[in-house]
Amino acid sequence: MLPQDPSTEPTPADDAAPVDSAGQASAPSPADPEGVAHPRRIRSFVRRAGRTSTGQQRAIDEVGPRMMVPYAPQPLDWEATFGRKAPSILEIGFGMGETTAHIAGLRPQDNFLGCEVHEPGVGALLKLIDERGLANVRILQHDAVEVIAHMLTDDCLDGVHIYFPDPWHKKRHNKRRLVQPPLVKVLAARLKPGGYIHCATDWEEYAHQMLEVLSGEPLLENTSTAADGFAERPDYRPVTKFERRGVRLGHGVWDVVFRKRAA
């Protein structure tokens, strides 16, 4: 097991920065629903300049070779990747990985594939995987939209987690938001019948956009019976430190859970 070290917090993205400096793809455009990489695509994230700590780098070097999956534009062999056949959950943008590790620990029967471009976050989750002995998590350090388009096949996923994606709160930046109809259409195709998409955000206007976009996908149905359409927080999703702080300040958090209709 790797030695402990303080976690490095991610540096918030500068919302004035228009693109990811690495030039990776992001949310697919309506003209390109399969998310094929294109250098002029509007991006839903920027690469943050957070420092990778010594412990995180050690985890990348020592744990990464076992737990990281290289990007390749060909279908992922889930059974070979995880060494077993099990329900498959995709997490898009896991941040520093605490929620991913928590859920994976609660649900050892499921396989979790996390996509994250931020290197300190990758290192932080690899440390947690090592410290907690998690065998059911793999990491792809690549733009999730390209992974979904080129590595995932239809009817391969049992669930998708999208927690606290960048809200791009300035109106002129709303088009950069991850949860948009073209991406949801592809995710719905990748889900098995009965599979779910679970989104969470602390930005109310984005929460309503998520609800509207998911409601507009014919393959999906809302699991909530509440009048406003939002779901109670599922027991498996932990309340993060950031979330607790927001609640103390009077901020809300909204969960949206949709399921793919039976074939």
From Swiss-Prot:
GO terms for molecular function: tRNA (guanine(46)-N7)-methyltransferase activity. Its EC number is 2.1.1.33. Substrate binds at K170, D202, T240, K241, F242, E243. PANTHER family: 3-DEOXY-D-MANNO-OCTULOSONIC-ACID TRANSFERASE/TRNA GUANINE-N 7 - -METHYLTRANSFERASE, PENTACOTRIPEPTIDE-REPEAT REGION OF PRORP DOMAIN-CONTAINING PROTEIN. It catalyses: guanosine(46) in tRNA + S-adenosyl-L-methionine = N(7)-methylguanosine(46) in tRNA + S-adenosyl-L-homocysteine. S-adenosyl-L-methionine binds at E91, E116, D143, D166. Residues 1-10 have a biased composition (Polar residues). Keywords: Methyltransferase, S-adenosyl-L-methionine, Transferase, tRNA processing. GO terms for cellular component: tRNA methyltransferase complex. This is tRNA (guanine-N(7)-)-methyltransferase. Pfam families: Methyltransf_4 (PF02390). Residues 1-38 are annotated as: Disordered. It comes from the Bacteria. Belongs to the class I-like SAM-binding methyltransferase superfamily. TrmB family. Catalyzes the formation of N(7)-methylguanine at position 46 (m7G46) in tRNA. Pathway: tRNA modification; N(7)-methylguanine-tRNA biosynthesis. Residues 172-177 are annotated as: Interaction with RNA. The lineage of its organism: Bacteria, Pseudomonadati, Pseudomonadota, Betaproteobacteria, Burkholderiales. The active site is at D166. The gene is trmB. It comes from Cupriavidus necator (strain ATCC 17699 / DSM 428 / KCTC 22496 / NCIMB 10442 / H16 / Stanier 337) (Ralstonia eutropha).
